[in-house]
Amino acid sequence: MFETRPNRADEIVLVGRSNVGKSTLMREITGHDSFATGGSPGVTTKPNHYDWAGDDFVITDLPGFGFMSGVPEDVRESIKRDVVQYIEAHADNILAGILVVDGKAVVDIIDRHSGPDEIPHDVEMFGFLQELGIPTVVAVNKMDKVDDRDERLDELAERLGLYPPWQQFDEMLAPISAKRGSIEPLNQAVRHHLHEQKRDDLFKFF
C-alpha cells in the first residue's frame, strides 16, 4: 500500500480512471501546479498529497486506475489494489471522496464494461466509497465537450443507481470543466459534505 500520507486528521481524496483530469482538477483546487499531467493515461502512479498542516488537513490525488497505455495488466491491478487499500485504511479520516469521471466518455465506458461477470470501474468505485460510508461526489469533468448535458448526466445518474433527474443529486453529481477552471458545482457539493461534518473552517479550500 502507499505509505506517503502525511499524518493529518482529515482528508479529501480524488479517485478515478486514468486520464480523466484528476491532476488538472487537483491543480485547480489547490492553486499548486507541481502535479503531473499528461495526455497519455497513467502519468500519476503514486499519490500526490497537498498538505495543510496548520489545518490538520490533506487533499490526496490517488493514482488513476483502469486502462494505461503500455502498462501491463498485473501492474494496473496492483495500482488499483493499492488505491482500494489506501481508501479502506483511511476511511475514518476521509471527509469526502471525489470520483472524477470523463463526462463525454463515462456512460459509453460503463456500458461497454457492464455484463454478468463485470462491474465497470467507475460504478464499482462509487459503490465502494458509499459502502465505506464516505460522502461521495462524482466530479463529471470535461463537460465543456458535452452537447446533450442534461441527458448525459441523467444517463450517468441511472448507471450509478440514482433515479433521474440528476439535478436532485447536486450534492453527489457535479458537472465541471477543470481545464477551464469551471469547478463551482464541485466546490458547492464538497462544502455541503464539510458542513454536515462540522468542518466549515475548510470552506476556504473549496
Swiss-Prot record:
Cofactor: Mg(2+)
Transmembrane intervals: none
Gene of this entry: engB
Identification of the protein by name: Probable GTP-binding protein EngB
Annotated binding of Mg(2+), by residue: 23, 44
Lineage, opening ranks: Archaea, Methanobacteriati, Methanobacteriota, Stenosarchaea group, Halobacteria
Function description: Necessary for normal cell division and for the maintenance of normal septation.
HAMAP family: GTPase_EngB (MF_00321)
Keywords assigned by UniProt, alphabetized: Cell cycle, Cell division, GTP-binding, Magnesium, Metal-binding, Nucleotide-binding, Septation
Family affiliation: Belongs to the TRAFAC class TrmE-Era-EngA-EngB-Septin-like GTPase superfamily. EngB GTPase family.
Domain EngB-type G: 8-196
GO BP annotation list: cell division
Keyword Nucleotide-binding set for record: yes
Record keyword GTP-binding present: yes
One Pfam family cited in the UniProt record for this chain: MMR_HSR1
Gene Ontology MF, one: metal ion binding
Parts forming coiled coils: none
Sequence positions that bind GTP: 16-23, 42-46, 61-64, 141-144, 176-178
